[in-house]
């Protein structure tokens, strides 16, 4: 009677095989593939279990599901491990993959392991090297010298997306600006398309689409030329609010603006050099204080006989528009705060119908123009058109559209990445490697003790003959940004060793269900959308969007614990200290992280409770998109449920599905109706990915079955309910479900059995309860046949309410079908 989960799970996992021919697949389910760090964690458990439930359910519905797995295997941690442990990144990565593969299999995930891939395998990255060469031909890849984000700790270039408030996204180091030759992909060629097509992604979370819309950052405005006094130069200023030009109080430029070369005040130059770039504001929601330095430069207002000071500020960035704006404090909150801090004038030029207090905040609404010369009396929209026309006539203005998004810099000065297939020849210049010579592979005899790029420091690897002229030449020693690999892997699963299969991709893509964290909303998801368009342009397939239904699961959180000195404690350490009477501070639940030690070892949980228990807990109570808090009581409760489920079903010795439903009467019908209503609800929940709701319903079904057994309900009704329960729990807790299926005599594997269909007759209520009211006040609840007609219902209601009506006259009777009947009675006239 005891449920031996270790024996059951090992037995069942050995019997599963989920091979699927991609050419025959009808539904593509994919979770964001893991980086092989060495161990899976609770976040992985949630991510992959959500996807597994969807895949298993769709199979049960008779759909041929494609559910592959792979490894996002390039990346900096492997190089760090090489340096720390004197181990080659290849060896470290392969060992981690082996370990994590075993861990994923232990969870019971229904992957087609025959489709497994790793991005560090030359058989994988040779195709992306070919993509790059085709991008080059199509004008989607180019090389230029550019001011780049240099991470001095990781010793590599970072994309704009990887710089958060002036610091490297991984190292946290203050990012420096350097000029280097870099390779870029022209994602901006598709900026408008990437923006507009967000509208067709109706199964993506709105917050993700808003994040991408913000990152693409389309701004339609004008560039106005301001004359810089004293140096015979012009400063181009971008604005989306030209109508506020008469309220301008200052010019603000980036700390990287070329105009700064004309600053000649040594004190100002020193202040610029001393500025800490971690205080750059790259997001409007940033809490960093606004800061500026008066450059000493002055520009002339293009329409007024006034001069404006030029400030160097931390809230204007050179990588957006022209890197310069004019500040109108009265009508922009950011400018308002800056003006108040530096005692700059606040001149109101837009006036609403009701007076506003500009002592507290800027006014950013509509209104009528005043103090604006020829714009006075116009609306904001009229003023925008008029001032643009005037400035254009004067030759100092042009309309323009800018995007916050820039081309994707893909060069990385790292070893553990895909080599860029380019050769540099003094005679021939930049020469692409011939496709027949791909892949360009990484050398394994690399010295990681030196700083900088290991490939550049390699004694022989980079030295080659030019494929065009045969003279001595050198390889490109940069490697691709690792997001290059993850931007097309979903298509790689649809391919063969010869590359992407165009027909299969066109048939199977976009991915029907894509599951992963919202932290990838901009980088990975946006790059994947770009890759679809770029590969389509190059003729690889004809796909616009990579993922049709995006499910962004919430984080797994746990309380933090700390001792009297404020040092973080692991949960097991905190528990022992509290048992010994020592003081432990319990903090709020936060995302599990090694740094805060609020982690739970997944291998320990699976060893102690089993994979099904871990799966059940991680799917219970909380919708997939919301954060879930790990609770020891919760995992214990899940374990108790499985033990009870096993005990109840194994002990039932009257299992028999050969029944005639016509012979089922009385309470047996009531129980069948409850069972089929729950089945219908679970089916509906799974159709809309309400996994926690489905869990609640099958636990309710378990309780009903226990009640039926206790009250000796017809064995056929109980047997049907047990069969339905076993089938509907399989996507969630597949090991115990498969074993119970065996024990009731099921033929074949349960995962391959059809999903049960609720009896439609049982879903229709034969009786309904209707509230009888007189003048809106309750009289009685009346149970009647579902198909009763209104006249009969009114007669019954009048009979029931006759005492309440008394001597009054019935003026009218209102019926809300199947809910309420209200009798309106008034005093006789």
UniProtKB/Swiss-Prot annotation:
One GO MF term attached to the UniProt entry: aminoacyl-tRNA deacylase activity
Positions of transmembrane segments: none
Keywords: Aminoacyl-tRNA synthetase, ATP-binding, Cytoplasm, Ligase, Nucleotide-binding, Protein biosynthesis
PROSITE patterns for this protein: AA_TRNA_LIGASE_I
GO cellular component assignments: cytosol
Enzyme class: ligase
Name by which UniProt lists this protein: Leucine--tRNA ligase
Source organism per UniProt: Ehrlichia chaffeensis (strain ATCC CRL-10679 / Arkansas)
High-level lineage: Bacteria, Pseudomonadati, Pseudomonadota, Alphaproteobacteria, Rickettsiales
Gene behind this protein: leuS
